[in-house]
């Protein structure tokens, strides 16, 4: 890879947001340099330089220019490297729908899951119900498709990486049950197919390490 195509990714090993970017880079076969950031301690001068507003990961650096926010980065990669593994449909309506569901995952489902697992106990029942209802909408949207993107992994699948891998880890670490195979058979099957993809599997963080870190940071409901 020549210098003008040099790609760097500033990320965090256990972050589903960072992993979204890595997944797309792997799926498209784009070589990149990965740089681990300590976002909970001393943020590096590079992170402060390339994302001075939010000071968060992930940050993609391409040709010396930086892009922040995981789904923005994913779209940038799609627009820049169009020849391999297309993740957004060409039809404008279908692209808009993909963006809608990706935003739904972030703003509805993921937020509710986090609150259900580690939010105030007084609000847990409400948040579990909200997360459950959000997952039911995704179950319906997935239907009988192999992936949200159809026959191959697409934009919504990448956005939903949290559901495919991290949700089970959150449930194990917190002791809160939201999604079961019996109630969400389509999402369960999708999760297995998604994390079973060789390119996806390659970048997933160790489950045991994530569970231990989450328990240390937040504790579990069953231990309270």
Swiss-Prot record:
Family membership noted in the UniProt record: Belongs to the GST superfamily. Tau family.
Residue positions, PTM Phosphothreonine: 152
Keyword Transferase: yes
GST C-terminal domain boundaries: 91-213
GO annotation, biological process: glutathione metabolic process; toxin catabolic process
UniProt-listed Pfam families: GST_C (PF00043), GST_N (PF02798)
Catalytic activity: RX + glutathione = an S-substituted glutathione + a halide anion + H(+)
Protein residues bound to glutathione: 15-16, 42-43, 56-57, 69-70
GST N-terminal domain residues: 5-85
Gene3D superfamilies hit by this protein: 1.20.1050.10, Glutaredoxin
Protein's cellular compartments: Cytoplasm, Cytosol
Gene expressing this chain: GSTU8
Cellular compartments per GO CC: cytoplasm; cytosol
EC number: 2.5.1.18
Keywords: Cytoplasm, Detoxification, Phosphoprotein, Transferase
Location (main, coarse): cytoplasm
Lineage: superkingdom: Eukaryota
Protein name in the entry: Glutathione S-transferase U8
Function: May be involved in the conjugation of reduced glutathione to a wide number of exogenous and endogenous hydrophobic electrophiles and have a detoxification role against certain herbicides.
MF-aspect GO terms: glutathione transferase activity
């Amino acid at each position: 890879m020549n210098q003008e195509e040099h790609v760097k990714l500033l990320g965090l090993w256990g972050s589903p947001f960072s992993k979204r970017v890595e997944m797309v880079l792997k799926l498209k076969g784009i070589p990149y340099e990965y740089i681990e950031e300590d976002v909970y301690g001393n943020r590096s001068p590079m992170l402060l330089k390339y994302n001075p507003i939010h000071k968060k990961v992930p940050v993609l650096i391409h040709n010396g220019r930086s892009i922040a926010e995981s789904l923005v980065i994913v779209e940038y990669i799609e627009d820049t490297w169009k020849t391999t593994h297309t993740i957004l449909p060409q039809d404008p309506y279908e692209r808009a729908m993909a963006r809608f569901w990706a935003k739904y995952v972030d703003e509805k489902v993921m937020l509710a899951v986090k609150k259900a697992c580690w939010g105030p106990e007084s609000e847990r029942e409400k948040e579990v119900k909200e997360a459950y209802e959000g997952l039911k909408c995704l179950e319906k949207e997935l239907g009988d498709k192999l992936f949200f993107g159809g026959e191959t992994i697409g934009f919504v699948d990448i956005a939903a990486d949290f559901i495919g891998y991290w949700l089970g880890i959150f449930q194990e670490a917190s002791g809160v049950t939201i999604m079961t195979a019996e109630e969400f058979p389509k999402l369960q099957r999708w999760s297995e197919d998604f994390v079973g993809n060789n390119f996806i599997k390659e970048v997933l963080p160790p489950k045991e390490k994530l569970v231990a870190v989450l328990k240390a940071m937040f504790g579990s409901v069953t231990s309270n």
